[in-house]
Design a protein with these regions (language model features):
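Catalytic cores of carbohydrate-active enzymes across secretory and cytosolic contexts
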Residues: 2-168
Length: 168
């Protein structure tokens, strides 16, 4: 639980397909007791369950990509790994650490170490006007977005999107 938001709220409100599948697979107990999600371990080798989970994940990534295309005009590779951090920007919320990781991955790609699966980093953030460090981190992310997305050697393997109309 963080800032009063629980996984149940996001799961039950934002991913009804997954919530429904979980209910069908392990029962409704997880809605009140997160420990009940451990029942999923019983299906770790069940290919039908794994296939359906992958299908739901793929559908949701496509929905997000369609939204981003409409709202931001950016086409996302839904076969990439999505790493998303959308929240008010603050030093303790690790956006800066994530930016440093992105720089590390960028330098690895430039050095010839290409990831086996492309990476997509999505940020949505705002900060108080007087919070200079947070404003600087947003600026860093915007500069990284420009560099990464326009580097023909890197952009096939990594994309960075700083959502313009952050509204959480």
């Amino acid at each position: 639980k963080t800032n009063g938001i629980t996984f149940r709220r996001w799961l039950l409100s934002c991913n009804r397909e997954l919530a429904s599948f979980l209910s069908d697979t392990i029962g409704d107990g997880f809605k009140k007791d997160a420990d009940k999600l451990e029942k999923l371990l019983e299906f770790a080798d069940d290919q039908a369950v794994l296939d359906r989970l992958a299908e739901i994940k793929s559908e949701k990534k496509k929905e997000l990509a369609a939204y981003v295309k409409e709202a931001e005009g950016v086409v996302l590779n839904t076969d990439s790994i999505f790493d998303i951090q959308v929240k008010r920007l603050h030093e303790y919320k690790r956006q800066q650490m994530n930016a440093l990781y992105i720089i590390h991955k960028y330098l690895e790609i430039k050095g010839g170490k290409k990831p086996s699966t492309p990476l997509t980093f999505i940020f949505g953030a705002k900060a108080a006007p007087a919070y200079v460090i947070a404003q600087d981190i947003i600026h860093l992310l915007l500069v990284l977005q420009e560099i990464i997305n326009h580097d023909p050697e890197v952009s096939p393997y990594m994309t960075l999107l700083m959502v313009e109309n952050y509204n959480v």
